């Protein structure tokens, strides 16, 4: 991929979880198409130009740096990733502080204080007045727990690792994070057997001091089968929207994308809403654009096997009322398009 393409994606804050070349191309196509759909003039001549050269954010590091997440605020931000050299026991979580123009500040730091097992799938969110939340899943396989840690505006961790619930809770995976307008954070995750069926999705509100502001609460209403892969986004009035995958809501062969709106203290403001057409859907992401929500997901083409996975998208108001039909975002159809993210 050309350097200019990578710079375009960085400027649009499109972050890639998988490192295959095809996912880079798919996300680039989706980003350009999605952007063209939300600008006020659909006929505008939108051109993207690089504003610098590609550079190594961390310098040369030992091992593999994977699963990068990036968050920037008015005072800079952090990039966070998992690698196999940060701690001596499998994967650890490392972070690099970034200034307001994207330059690295200092050297990478280790985020996790607990070392047992693998620490994976990190996310980071900036506190408006400075500081950040980090969240990840850690522990031995089959005994994962969601961990989090808070750093203050001086870049100092205010505590050791915290558990989203308790160290003896059931299996917890697939953490997601968003910082609300009041500076508190929503942590969401997938748990096992906690909703009376198989997998479910839960969340908890965490304060800037690292202390929980609520008990954990259930995101999903529909319990049959698996509810998993939740993503959350902050809303302008202080609450948040959550989306996730729900097995077999529309029929016994469907994998559905659903969503729900919550207040800033975790109280549901709507029922669950099925967001995607009936079919095989996966890995939703959600973003706020103005006063609308854009939801994108991977959708399996059941009619033409050579095309396989596409990127679908749809827009909604802040109560999850649809503003458009679902549409395919990618121009390239043959093969798999996957691992999209948007900001």
Label each PLM-derived region with a short phrase.
Residues 1-24:
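N-terminal secretory signal peptides that target proteins for export/translocation
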Residues 28-41:
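Bacterial N-terminal signal peptides
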Residues 24-28, 100:
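Alpha-helical and His/Cys-centered functional microenvironments
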Residues 45-343:
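Extracellular, repeat-based ectodomains that mediate carbohydrate processing or recognition
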Residues 8-10, 16, 29, 88, ...:
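N-terminal compositionally biased or targeting/leader segments
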């Amino acid at each position: 991929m050309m350097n200019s393409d990578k710079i375009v994606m960085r400027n649009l804050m499109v972050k890639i979880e998988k490192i295959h070349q095809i996912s880079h191309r798919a996300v680039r196509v989706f980003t350009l198409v999605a952007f063209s759909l939300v600008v006020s003039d659909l006929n505008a001549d939108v051109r993207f130009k690089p504003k610098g050269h590609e550079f190594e954010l961390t310098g040369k590091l030992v091992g593999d740096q994977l699963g990068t997440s990036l968050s920037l605020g008015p005072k800079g931000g952090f990039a966070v990733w998992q690698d196999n050299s940060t701690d001596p026991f499998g994967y650890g979580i490392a972070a690099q502080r970034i200034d307001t123009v994207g330059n690295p500040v200092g050297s990478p730091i280790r985020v996790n204080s607990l070392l047992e097992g693998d620490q994976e799938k990190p996310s980071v969110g900036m506190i408006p007045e400075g500081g950040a939340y980090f969240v990840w899943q850690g522990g031995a396989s089959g005994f994962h727990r969601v961990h989090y840690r808070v750093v203050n505006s001086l870049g100092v961790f205010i505590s050791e690792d915290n558990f989203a619930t308790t160290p003896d809770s059931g299996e917890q995976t697939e953490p997601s994070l968003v910082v609300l307008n009041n500076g508190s954070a929503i942590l969401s995750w997938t748990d096992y057997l906690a909703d009376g069926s198989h997998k479910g999705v839960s969340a908890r509100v965490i304060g800037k001091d690292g202390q929980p502001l609520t008990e954990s609460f259930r995101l999903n209403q529909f319990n049959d089968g698996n509810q998993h892969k939740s993503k959350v986004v902050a809303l302008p009035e202080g609450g948040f929207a959550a989306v996730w995958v729900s097995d077999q809501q529309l029929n016994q062969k469907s994998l559905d994308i659903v969503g729900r709106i919550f207040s800033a203290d975790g109280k549901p403001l709507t029922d669950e809403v099925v967001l995607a057409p009936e079919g095989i859907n996966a890995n939703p992401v959600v973003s706020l654009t103005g006063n609308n929500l854009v939801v994108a997901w991977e959708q399996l083409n059941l009619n033409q096997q050579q095309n396989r996975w596409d990127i679908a998208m749809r827009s909604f108001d802040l109560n999850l009322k649809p503003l458009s039909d679902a549409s395919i975002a990618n121009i390239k159809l043959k093969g798999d398009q996957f691992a999209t993210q948007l900001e």
